[in-house]
């Protein structure tokens, strides 16, 4: 399949989920993005009129951003497919993004897994990085966000960062290696 549809709710209580369409061809997407960035680098008009001081750094950051989105999509879609085969009524797997409408500062989880049977939820940030950085956990340490998830989905049992580094634990946050995580959902 070219893409997978995943329903995303802001709350189980209120319903009204939206469909997330996750493209299933990360290699194709990355190839297109890389070609567009290469064309941008070679574009004389862009080079002469763009007010970005360090264009090489801009291109590198754009590439890094694309890789981050692709990693999020891969982990979300593979985790979703895994839990759908286990028990699609028991497990809810999606993304979560809330904000002012929910009475919160903008907060998100790149991956939320809710076990409806055990009445517990797990929140994940997904980062295309091999470094542990405090900023990676800002949503996972936001007490208002954790309370919101606990009230609107199920009590939060664990918060984790999935990244490209070695597994470790800092305070209450587990850092999981992305490759190892993906191997567990296959």
Tell me the role of every PLM-derived stretch.
Residues 161-186:
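Domain-level recognition of nuclease-like catalytic cores that cleave nucleotide substrates
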């Amino acid at each position: 399949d070219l893409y997978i549809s995943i329903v995303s709710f802001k709350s189980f209580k209120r319903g009204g989920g939206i469909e997330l369409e996750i493209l299933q061809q990360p290699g194709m997407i990355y190839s297109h993005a890389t070609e567009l960035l290469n064309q941008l680098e070679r574009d004389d008009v862009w080079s002469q009129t763009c007010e970005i001081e360090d264009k090489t750094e801009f291109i590198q950051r754009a590439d890094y951003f694309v890789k981050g989105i692709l990693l999020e999509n891969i982990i979300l879609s593979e985790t979703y497919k895994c839990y759908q085969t286990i028990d699609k009524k028991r497990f809810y797997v999606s993304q979560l993004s809330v904000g002012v409408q929910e009475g919160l500062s903008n907060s998100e989880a790149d991956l939320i897994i809710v076990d409806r049977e055990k009445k517990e939820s797990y929140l994940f940030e997904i980062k295309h990085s091999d470094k542990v950085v405090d900023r990676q956990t800002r949503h996972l340490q936001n007490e208002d966000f954790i309370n919101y998830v606990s009230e609107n989905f199920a009590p939060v049992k664990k918060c984790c960062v999935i990244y490209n580094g070695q597994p470790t634990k800092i305070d209450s946050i587990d850092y999981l290696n992305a490759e190892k995580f993906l191997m567990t959902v296959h």
